[in-house]
Curated annotation (Swiss-Prot):
Task performed by this protein: The main replicative DNA helicase, it participates in initiation and elongation during chromosome replication. Travels ahead of the DNA replisome, separating dsDNA into templates for DNA synthesis. A processive ATP-dependent 5'-3' DNA helicase it has DNA-dependent ATPase activity.
CDD domains linked to this entry: DnaB_C
UniProt-listed PROSITE patterns: SF4_HELICASE (PS51199)
Signal peptide coordinates: none
One matching Pfam family: DnaB
Protein name: Replicative DNA helicase DnaB
EC number in record: 5.6.2.3
Species this chain originates from: Helicobacter pylori (strain J99 / ATCC 700824) (Campylobacter pylori J99)
Length: 486
């Protein structure tokens, strides 16, 4: 009896809200930001709200005359229901009634979901991981006031497309439609990191891909976006240290050893306060599965609507949900699910990847798409694939190889002299930030051109910087040191 009384009260609340729309048509936009027609318990009320929305779309008055005209022939609202709606007494505090309708709708959907979970759990053929993933998606949809929709009509899609074109026109000559990468020339290729896209950033070890990632993180923060960083290799504190070094222009060595003068301490304090105000979130557990990343991002997005981008360092350290699969199959599954998650949350996801060692055997060590380790479906799933290449790293390795060769030939003194010289040059290079060129190679770009972006890497501050177009150094001149002969 109590339940029946509650339903009668709910119907009355729905009538009052609909009557309020008839009295004040402009309120429908605010109400629609919370409610959908499916949120109404009593079906005729949901149909009434749907008709009212269609009238509002074409700037028609929402009144008794137009409601009756627009009523579909196959779905009629009874005369008694119409009279009850138009006769209901609207109230001033309609927001509370709207929330009550939404609250009741969510409870009904939760009840339905609970029954579905029970039925699926009793089916022995259903895998628990599949059930959990489905539950996560449904709960996330409820938290965001939406449902998992089916087909979208061409009219709706075209309207959305035109809104996007109009928004880009409003931005004028700006070429960045997504989140700025932090590099003007890279933005010219990509138009920034756009929502729903999966971006792969690949490099060999020691190339500095984590530093490049942190540069991109800071760029997104400057665009007032919320940023999530999954760091499976470095602690959050280590990444924060790099960010502070970049922002303060205090080299990492001095920052770690706290050898700072008064001005540097003051600068550090200012940057600390500035960065503390940003929406930057770290998840730095060394072991993480794909389903955990999905759960954490959904939770973070529901708590912080301004979340605009996520970074993962790096993909091959993640674990698949099904341990029985071959590793390349797990990686392919992870990349596919990351792409799906990016579209679901409507954010770009940037995943760092390790490249195959085999590229070291080539004369030209610039990466190509086939160098992606355990590539599987990564290349296929990615909207953009970026590679990082620093010739200076290979120059150092060539110097080390020459020293080893001299030792094997018995030229110990010559090897020691070269070793001392090389170490001193590297120390000066690291401390003083000698000019070093770095290439960001756009190897795949689903919606644009491919090519190479030239930047400078400022080693002491782990900072990548824009380089003017066509001003990059010639091969073998990226530093003041010459490539050693063999």
């Amino acid at each position: 009896m109590d339940h029946l009384k509650h339903l009668q009260q709910l119907q009355n609340i729905e009538r009052i809200v609909l009557s309020g729309i008839v009295l004040a048509n402009h309120k429908i936009e605010e109400i629609h930001s919370v409610l959908e027609p499916s949120d109404f318990y009593y079906p005729p009320h949901g149909l009434f709200f749907e008709i009212a929305l269609k009238l509002h779309e074409v700037n028609c008055p929402i009144d008794e005359n137009f409601i009756r005209q627009k009523m579909p022939k196959d779905k009629q609202i009874s005369e008694d229901d119409l009279v009850a709606i138009f006769a209901a007494s609207p109230i001033d505090n309609i927001e509370a009634y709207v929330e009550e309708i939404k609250n009741a709708s969510i409870k009904r959907k939760l009840f339905t979901l609970a029954n579905t979970i029970r039925e699926q759990a009793l089916e022995s053929a259903q895998k628990s991981s599949d059930i959990l993933n489905a539950v996560e998606r449904e709960v996330y949809a409820l938290l965001n006031g939406s449902t998992i929709e089916g087909f979208r009509g061409i009219k709706e899609v075209l309207e959305s497309t035109m809104n996007l074109i109009t928004e880009n026109q409003r931005k004028g000559s700006l070429k960045v439609t997504g989140i700025p990468t932090g590099f003007v020339q890279l933005d010219n290729y990509t138009s920034g990191f756009n929502q729903g896209s999966l971006v792969i950033l690949g490099a060999r070890p020691s190339m500095g891909k984590t530093s490049l990632m942190m540069n991109m993180v800071l760029s997104a923060l400057n665009d007032d976006r919320g940023v999530a960083v999954f760091s499976l290799e470095m602690s959050a504190e280590q990444l924060a240290l790099r960010a502070l070094s970049d922002l303060t222009s205090i080299n990492m060595h001095d920052l770690e050893s706290a050898r700072l003068d008064d001005d540097q301490w003051e600068n550090l304090a200012k940057c600390f306060d500035h960065l503390s105000q940003k929406k930057l979130f770290f998840y730095d557990k060394s072991y993480v599965r794909m389903d955990q990343i999905r759960l954490q991002l959904r939770k973070l997005k529901s708590q912080h609507k301004e979340l605009g981008i996520a970074f993962i360092d790096y993909l091959q350290l993640m674990s698949g949900n099904k341990a029985t699969k071959e590793r390349h199959e797990q990686i392919a599954e992870i990349s596919r699910e990351l792409k799906t998650l990016a579209r679901e949350l409507e954010i770009p996801i940037i995943a760092l990847v390790q490249l195959n060692r085999s590229l070291e055997n080539r004369d030209d060590k610039r990466p190509i798409l086939s160098d992606i380790k355990d590539s599987g479906g990564i290349e296929q799933d990615a909207d953009i694939v970026l590679f990082l290449y620093r010739g200076y790293i290979y120059q150092m390795r060539a110097e080390d190889n020459k020293i080893d060769k001299l030792k094997k030939e018995g030229k110990v003194e010559e090897a020691q002299e070269l070793h001392l010289k090389v170490n001193e040059e590297r120390r000066i290079h690291k401390q003083n930030g000698s000019i070093e060129e770095a290439e960001i190679i756009v190897a795949k770009n689903r919606n644009g051109a491919t090519g190479t972006v030239y930047t400078r890497f400022n080693a002491p501050f782990t900072r990548y910087e824009d380089m003017p177009v066509d001003s990059h150094l010639e091969e073998g001149q990226e530093t003041k040191f010459e490539m050693p002969t063999t």
